[in-house]
Every structure is written in C-alpha cells, then in structure tokens.
Regions:
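N-terminal membrane topogenic signal
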Residues: 1-8
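Hydrophobic core segments of alpha-helical transmembrane domains in multi-pass membrane transport
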Residues: 14-19, 35-36, 40, 67-74, ...
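Structural signature of hydrophobic alpha-helical transmembrane segments
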Residues: 25-41, 61, 85-96, 166
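A glycine-rich, hydrophobic loop/mini-helix early in the fold
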Residues: 35, 39-76
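C-terminal ends of transmembrane helices
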Residues: 42-55, 102-112, 178-182
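Cytoplasmic-side transmembrane-helix entry/capping segments in multi-pass membrane proteins
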Residues: 53-66, 87-93, 117-120
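Transmembrane alpha-helix boundary signature
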Residues: 72-87
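C-terminal transmembrane helix-loop-helix hairpin of multi-pass membrane proteins
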Residues: 116-185
C-alpha cells in the first residue's frame, strides 16, 4: 500500500480528500493520519466480526463500523486539534464514504486475520498519508514558497493557481506521471 499499491498515485482512490484537502503539507498529513486511524481501526474490527456478519448485510455493517470510528475521530480532533479539525471541515465526515476504507474492508479485512488486517490498514494508511503530504507539500511550495508553513522563498514567490482547486489537479497529474515513469524505469 505504501508504494506498489499506493492508493493515491497508483490505484487513484480517495480523490475527493486528495484534491480537496492538500492545499498544504500539514493539511495533507492531517487528513492522511485521520484516514489511517479509521482504516486501521475499522480493518481490525471488521476482521474480528467477519464470521458474525451475514453476507446480505455485510456492506451496511462495514459502513456502520467505519462511521463509528469517523465519529470518534471527529470528537478527538475537535477536542485536541481544533484548528486542523476546522481546516479539514467537511472532509472528515466524508472519510466514511472514502472508497479506500470500504475497499480494504471488503477485499482484505473480511477475509484475513486481525493482525494481517492491522498491517494492511497501516500500509494503505501510510501510503495515503505520504501521498497527501507530498501533494500538499508540492502545492504549498509552488503556491506560497512555504513548506509546513515555513517560508523557504521570498514573500512575493508563488503561483496562486497551486493553492486553488486547479492546482490540485495539475500537481496530482504531474506526480502520477512521475510515479508511472519511475515504475517503468
């Protein structure tokens, strides 16, 4: 999940938070870590209850498990990192419908042990976090001349388009192209 099956650069999953929250490296890292928390926790729980869940209601049960951890995450973030919680806003509850989580629950956690599911969640979560942090860092640097909110270039440096929505598409496209080029080499 970190490199070969990176959810962002290879599988192209989770594009809504990828494009919407990566205006800075800190935001990308925050969203990635939040998603990783939910992914690990939901993978382990789904792996533990897989034999108790009838096939007919499997997907709704998985969504309830994921939503429960997202709700817990929201409360924790609101209490301990309110600035990041406010910045990420609507994208936190949207973790529930992130196809990475439901995909890993269905494809991996429902068929494997809790320990294997933990490591699957960790790997996919790290891959997602790394990708969002890199994309956020590229956009922040090109858009403002900063990285992790530390000025690296003069104040008048920056291309505004990279902190706006079109910049997300442009930067993501180039990063995917670089990953594809490196895979072929």
């Amino acid at each position: 999940g970190i490199v070969k099956e990176n959810p962002t650069f290879v599988l192209l999953l989770g594009m809504c938070p990828t494009l919407g929250t990566t205006s800075s490296a800190i935001n990308g890292m925050g969203m990635g870590l939040a998603t990783m928390f939910v992914l690990i926790c939901s993978n382990v729980v789904i792996s533990l209850i897989k034999k108790l869940v009838p096939d007919m209601v499997r997907i709704p049960i998985f969504v309830v498990v994921i939503a429960s951890f997202v709700t817990l995450l929201q409360m924790i973030m609101q209490a301990y990192v309110p600035a990041l919680y406010a910045t990420l806003g609507l994208f936190i509850p949207l973790i529930v419908v992130n196809c990475i989580l439901l995909g890993r629950a269905e494809a991996f956690a429902a068929k494997n042990t809790p320990l294997a599911s933990f490591f699957d969640g960790l790997g996919m979560g790290l891959g997602f976090t790394i990708a969002l942090t890199i994309l956020g860092g590229v956009r922040e640097f090109l858009g403002t001349g900063k990285l992790f909110n530390i000025a690296l270039m003069p104040e008048n440096y920056g291309m505004l388009i990279f902190v706006l929505a079109p910049g997300a598409f442009i930067a993501l496209g180039y990063l995917i192209a670089i990953v594809n080029k490196l895979k072929k080499a």
